[in-house]
């Protein structure tokens, strides 16, 4: 998993629940490095996060669980410096990603493709 995610670019869109009349908004995540941590199911992803007015690179210690052979990036009340507290479930399959996200009282869906340089 660490090798697959290192150098991966997640490029896609996100929606905001309750705003179905609006088009999805663009998002991009570049994982420059992913390394397995000693704790079970834990990985450190050094990621550049771009959405809205945000463009920042941060280290994220995240749990990656497995649904059979499918990895699911898992965040529960996870604080990201300069961005806030988030929850998410992001499923990875066949060089695509999809999932749900939550930021305080606001949430929605996210989806896109995973590209490697």
Where are these predicted regions, by residue range?
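Central antiparallel beta-sheet cores of small beta-barrel/beta-sandwich binding domains
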Residues: 4-117
């Amino acid at each position: 998993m660490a090798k697959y995610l290192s150098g991966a670019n997640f490029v896609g869109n996100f929606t905001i629940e309750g705003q179905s009349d609006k088009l999805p908004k663009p998002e991009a995540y570049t994982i420059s490095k992913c390394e397995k941590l000693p704790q079970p199911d834990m990985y450190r992803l050094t990621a550049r996060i771009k959405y809205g007015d945000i463009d920042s690179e941060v280290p994220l210690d995240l749990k990656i669980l497995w649904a059979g052979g499918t990895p699911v990036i898992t965040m529960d009340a996870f604080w990201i410096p300069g961005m806030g507290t988030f929850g998410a479930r992001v499923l990875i399959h066949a060089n695509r990603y999809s999932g749900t996200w939550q930021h305080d009282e606001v949430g929605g869906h996210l989806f896109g493709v995973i590209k490697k340089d």
